[in-house]
Amino acid sequence: MAANQHLVLELFKSGEFKQRLIFLLAALFVFRIGAHIPVPGVDAAALNDFYQNSTNGILNMLNMFSGGSLERFSIFAIGIMPYISASIVVQLASEIIPTLKALKKEGEAGRKIITKYTRLCTVFLATLQGVAAAAFVYQQNVVVIGQIEFYFSTIICLVTGTMFLMWLGEQITERGIGNGISLIIMAGIASGIPFGVSQFLNVATNNLALALIVVISVLFLVYIVVYFESAQRKIPVHYARNSNSQGFLGKSNHLPFKLNMAGVIPPIFASSIILFPVTIIGWFRGGNNVGWVQKLLLWLQHGNSVYISFFAVSIIFFCYFYTALVFSPKEMAENLKKSGAFVPGVRPGIQTSLYLENVVMRITLWGAVYITVICLIPELFSSILGAGLSLGGTSLLILVVVAMDFSTQVSSYRVSQQYEQLMKKYNRDIVS
């Protein structure tokens, strides 16, 4: 505890860290303020009554990711999910369309163009979800203004809100601490914890044994997440250097590969894939769902076996997909060869590339299984108990992983500060 306090005091001596922390807190405060600014023309009391009586799992998940903005129908009601969906679409397209694939290889200039396409796709998807949200809310008889006026103002407010959150996330990443989009999602989820705690206390008073099981399960899942997120596969690497007297002398090192290289991206992407089409169908059909639409919405409710199966398959797919995006074994093998490094027992070049690819595929399988289990255990609890849990596996994973990433970022600032102090002392000694 004393060590943590000393770390905080040390960091606050750094002007840059203070500025970044203040910017982060201010940005998250703006996000929470925006989550309480309602879209004009809606009877807030009537809308609140509707959500209190709703058992729609899709709506509850959307509400979780938006930080409670959906139940208040605020300007951030559709949240950051259109941006996440757009990122999926553009990243998939960049693996299929030759023009986009070429842009990925053009460095910073290509990245800026791809970012522009992602933003345009975000506007398109946010508009679709804005229209769907307006249609859904209008069907609930909670609107107090004209239909055309309501649709126009709602779409403008929701699309603007999503684009603002996208911009805010980018600013946090650039000028704050950690990944902005992840921190916004985390802040939204964390805002629902007080309500979840109150629900849990109600359960605890009625069923102490169940409450104890839930507490033990949550603590165990947190431990598992921390353990697996810290797990690494270390591949030994030798660096050869020339020596006139003894030929080649080796210097040993290792390449650390995280068990979960994809982080929280797979469950977020999987949730987005499930939420977007079902939300569009359900919101446009309102309360008149019949036939296959009604059956589809029923299948994709939380706790349903079809939903659990589809969610699991989607998580595993995105684990492999995102890992393939962020890691190139061929490029790493080439870099090792150029630096005179080699993996013991493996020939440099293509053999090293195949070896690294094989290692990453194996650890990605274990990482995918781990994420899937963490995300699905609460879903299975919901199915068995016949009651929804306020803190799902995806929420728990995001909270713990983003918190760990934030802690890592803070530690890196500490190391950077110590290095700067060391360099200043060294320069003073040189001058004197």
What are these regions (language model features)?
Residues 1-104, 109-432:
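N-terminal cationic and glycine-rich segments that engage phosphates or anionic surfaces
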